[in-house]
Amino acid sequence: MWRPTSASAETTKTPLTICWIPIKRWVSSASLPCGAIYRQVWESAAFAGFLTGREAARRMVGRGRGTVIFTGATASVRGGPGFASFAGAKHALRALAQSMARELGPKGIHVGHIIVDGMIDSDAVRSKFPEKTAALPVGGMLNPDHIADAYWGMHAQPRDAWTFEMDLRPSVEQW
């Protein structure tokens, strides 16, 4: 399992904070979601991302360094049938990340957006989608440790070569 090394923690002298905000309901038809559902999904992704990013940036600007990484999905760049609420929220989160990156980059804050495109290999996913996960080929789901490595790699980039966005997906994922 991935863990930051004690050497990396000692050299940065910066606390590592991770914030995860799950979206509980994200599948809805463009013709069916009521305003309350659309708003709930938007608040869980876009507005929560804004609040979290704003508060993190406020604390980082004074130090002149820090990293804020937002997690996207395929819906960040492409809507699909049945994903109206989720796609709208993820598009908004990606636009927020772009705006923050342009504003905060010159102040030493690295803002990035990582699109996680595919099923994540976990007990929760395997129990919720047993038939689908069983049918996947070896390497058909994203390994959580490999996802963490990508996030850490983005965080550790030198200032002269910052990545704004990367896509993570299994090699067999259709995209």
Question: What is each stretch, according to the model?
Answer:
Residues P106-I109, H113-G118, T133-W175:
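C-terminal helical subdomain
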Residues G53-R54:
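A short, exposed helix-loop element centered on a Lys and neighboring polar residues
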Residues V61-G62, L104-P106:
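A short hydrophobic alpha-helix cap/turn motif
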